[in-house]
Regions:
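Receiver (REC) domain active-site loop signature in two-component systems and cognate sites
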Residues: 57, 69
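Non-catalytic signal-transmission and effector/linker regions of two-component phosphorelay proteins
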Residues: 1-5, 120-137
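Helix N-cap/capping motif at the beta->alpha junctions
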Residues: 32-41, 62
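Conserved acidic carboxylate
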Residues: 10
Length: 137
């Protein structure tokens, strides 16, 4: 089986190291970016199988990168796991508000994980998304 490539976009160095280490020790090929601008560049270069994306980042934030991904036909089908300290209900509501007036509203991410992050939970989500399995609501 081909090793799956996962891009981690996270501004916090310690969290970036933690997530990439968890993924690599579980057999995934993980690369990391410190912000959305670098993340978009790596998506174009590496074509990852899945993206783990922090919502709150300075400069090119996670939501802005998410919007770029989901409105680009080349990348819109790459599964995205959003990470945030914000409750998922609050995030999904703000995503819906940002979509008002757009011809094609932004879809909800394939998964949303609240911080503090649990390695087991993240790996379970990654495994299911890469296998094309549905996630529990």
């Amino acid at each position: 089986m081909k090793e799956k490539n996962i891009l981690v976009v996270e501004d916090d160095l310690h969290m970036r190291i933690f997530i990439t280490t968890v993924l690599e020790t579980s057999g995934y090929n993980a690369t990391a970016s410190k912000d959305g601008q670098e993340g978009i560049r790596k998506v174009k270069e590496d074509r990852p199988d899945l993206i783990i994306l922090d919502v709150m980042m300075p400069e090119e934030g996670g939501v802005s990168m998410y919007r770029q991904l989901k409105t680009d036909n080349q990348f819109k089908n790459i599964p995205v796991v959003m990470l945030s300290g914000v409750e998922s209900k609050t995030f999904l509501h703000s995503l819906k508000m940002m979509s008002i007036g757009l011809r094609n509203p932004l879809p909800a991410p394939e998964a949303y994980v609240e911080k503090p992050l649990k390695a087991e939970e993240l790996l379970n989500i990654v495994q299911k998304l890469l296998a094309g399995e549905p996630l529990p609501e």
